[in-house]
Amino acid sequence: MEQTLSIIKPDAVAKNVVGKIIDRFESNGLKVAAAKRLQLSRADAEQFYAVHKERPFFKDLVDFMVSGPVVAMVLEGENAVLKNRDLMGATDPKKAAPGTIRADFADSIDANAVHGSDSLENAKIEIAFFFSGREIN
C-alpha cells in the first residue's frame, strides 16, 4: 500500500480545521497511518525544505512553518501520493479547484493549509524525516 506525507500547516491548525482536513483524506480512501502535532524548529524547517534553499520564497516559507504548530501525518492508500495532491489542489488557493482542501481552507499561496509529498521517492524521505518505522501502523 502506498504511503505519503501530509503536513497540515500553521494557518490551518490555527483555524481549527484539522479535523475537517483529516475527514477529507479519510472519506476519499486515505487512512491516517501515523500522526503527530509538533512545533517545528527553524533548523527542522530549513532542513525539511532544503530543496528550496536557493529559491526567493525560502525564508518566508521557513518563517511561516515555524510560526505555529503543524500536524504531520502518514497517509496510506492506493495511489496515495497522487490522491493526496488531487485533494490538496493547486499550490495557489486562488487557482485551486472548488472542493479541494486549499480552495476551502487556504488564504494565500504562502498560507496554503497543507503540504503533500510530490513523488513516491520524496514521500519515503519526508516520512522518515518525521516518523520512525515503529510509529507507523
Swiss-Prot record:
<feature type="binding site">
    <location>
        <position position="85"/>
    </location>
    <ligand>
        <name>ATP</name>
    </ligand>
</feature>
<keyword id="KW-0597">Phosphoprotein</keyword>
<keyword id="KW-0479">Metal-binding</keyword>
<dbReference type="InterPro" id="IPR036850">
    <property type="entry name" value="NDK-like_dom_sf"/>
</dbReference>
<keyword id="KW-0460">Magnesium</keyword>
<dbReference type="Pfam" id="PF00334">
    <property type="entry name" value="NDK"/>
</dbReference>
<dbReference type="InterPro" id="IPR023005">
    <property type="entry name" value="Nucleoside_diP_kinase_AS"/>
</dbReference>
<dbReference type="GO" id="GO:0046872">
    <property type="term" value="F:metal ion binding"/>
</dbReference>
<dbReference type="GO" id="GO:0005737">
    <property type="term" value="C:cytoplasm"/>
</dbReference>
<feature type="binding site">
    <location>
        <position position="102"/>
    </location>
    <ligand>
        <name>ATP</name>
    </ligand>
</feature>
<dbReference type="GO" id="GO:0006228">
    <property type="term" value="P:UTP biosynthetic process"/>
</dbReference>
<dbReference type="InterPro" id="IPR001564">
    <property type="entry name" value="Nucleoside_diP_kinase"/>
</dbReference>
<keyword id="KW-0963">Cytoplasm</keyword>
<feature type="binding site">
    <location>
        <position position="9"/>
    </location>
    <ligand>
        <name>ATP</name>
    </ligand>
</feature>
<feature type="active site" description="Pros-phosphohistidine intermediate">
    <location>
        <position position="115"/>
    </location>
</feature>
<feature type="binding site">
    <location>
        <position position="91"/>
    </location>
    <ligand>
        <name>ATP</name>
    </ligand>
</feature>
<dbReference type="InterPro" id="IPR034907">
    <property type="entry name" value="NDK-like_dom"/>
</dbReference>
<comment type="function">
    <text>Major role in the synthesis of nucleoside triphosphates other than ATP. The ATP gamma phosphate is transferred to the NDP beta phosphate via a ping-pong mechanism, using a phosphorylated active-site intermediate.</text>
</comment>
<feature type="binding site">
    <location>
        <position position="112"/>
    </location>
    <ligand>
        <name>ATP</name>
    </ligand>
</feature>
<keyword id="KW-0067">ATP-binding</keyword>
<keyword id="KW-0546">Nucleotide metabolism</keyword>
<comment type="subunit">
    <text>Homotetramer.</text>
</comment>
<dbReference type="GO" id="GO:0004550">
    <property type="term" value="F:nucleoside diphosphate kinase activity"/>
</dbReference>
<dbReference type="GO" id="GO:0006183">
    <property type="term" value="P:GTP biosynthetic process"/>
</dbReference>
<dbReference type="GO" id="GO:0005524">
    <property type="term" value="F:ATP binding"/>
</dbReference>
<keyword id="KW-0418">Kinase</keyword>
<keyword id="KW-0808">Transferase</keyword>
<feature type="binding site">
    <location>
        <position position="57"/>
    </location>
    <ligand>
        <name>ATP</name>
    </ligand>
</feature>
<keyword id="KW-0547">Nucleotide-binding</keyword>
<dbReference type="GO" id="GO:0006241">
    <property type="term" value="P:CTP biosynthetic process"/>
</dbReference>
<comment type="similarity">
    <text>Belongs to the NDK family.</text>
</comment>
<protein>
    <recommendedName>
        <fullName>Nucleoside diphosphate kinase</fullName>
        <ecNumber>2.7.4.6</ecNumber>
    </recommendedName>
</protein>
